[in-house]
Amino acid sequence: TKAFSTQLAVVYLIGLYCAEALGTLDEAEYDRIVSELLLIPTKLEQILDNRADIQYFASLYFNHPSIFFIGRNIDYAIGMEGSLKLKEISYIHSEAYAAGELKHGTISLIEPGTLVVALASYVKLFDKTMSNVVEVKSRGADVLGLTVDARAADMAKTVDHVIPVPDTHPLLLPSLDVVPMQLFAYYVALQRGCDIDKPRNLAKSVTVE
């Protein structure tokens, strides 16, 4: 949602300001991050231009009783946001799990036909996350994957469907990754006939203690 994306932008700016003030980021890296930050709106438009694909994926899976999200590091956090949005507006049971924790009980929830949304946008963690994808696939799960353009072809060899996001500086990936997750929740809710603008039992802001 707009609040989540705006908070990310504010945190980026605060982080850059502090790094510059403390001298913990060299000038070249600082300039690179700022340049990529300015390109985020354009790259978000690219994602929105491909939203028909996400709508199609939603049409395939909107009747699933449970949908699980997995990811490592910040991908896990974005998975939690995607799972939360899905629960809020589509009323589907959904949980997000750290991919590295799958073997500690979570994987017992996977059965044939279960949908797992796997986020693997960080190149350094891609192979480890994909090893978890192989584990859930071997147990019959359907997998919808999200990764950067540079690794989309590799991911497509294992998962059922891929949502690619434009490449950017690793620190800025959450701003791109979160939008397909929110769109997926939106289109799933539409398919289910839910009132997206007025989710049940939710208020726009917290007004009571």
Question: Where do the protein language model's features map onto the residues?
Answer:
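Generic C-terminus detector
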Residues: 142, 168-209
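Composition- and surface-driven signal marking solvent-exposed, interaction-prone regions
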Residues: 81-82, 98, 128-133, 158, ...
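Glycine-rich, anion-gripping cofactor-binding loops and their flanking helix/strand elements
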Residues: 101-137, 168-182, 190
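Glycine-rich phosphate-binding loops that contact phosphosugars or nucleotide phosphates
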Residues: 1-39, 120-162, 184
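A cross-family phosphate/adenosyl-ligand binding-site feature
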Residues: 151, 157-178
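Active-site proximal loops enriched in glycine and acidic residues that flank catalytic Cys/His/Asp
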Residues: 71-73, 82, 98, 120-123, ...
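Alpha-helix N-cap/helix-start and coil->helix boundary motif
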Residues: 75-76, 152, 181
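Active-site phosphate/pyrophosphate-binding segments
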Residues: 1-115, 189-209
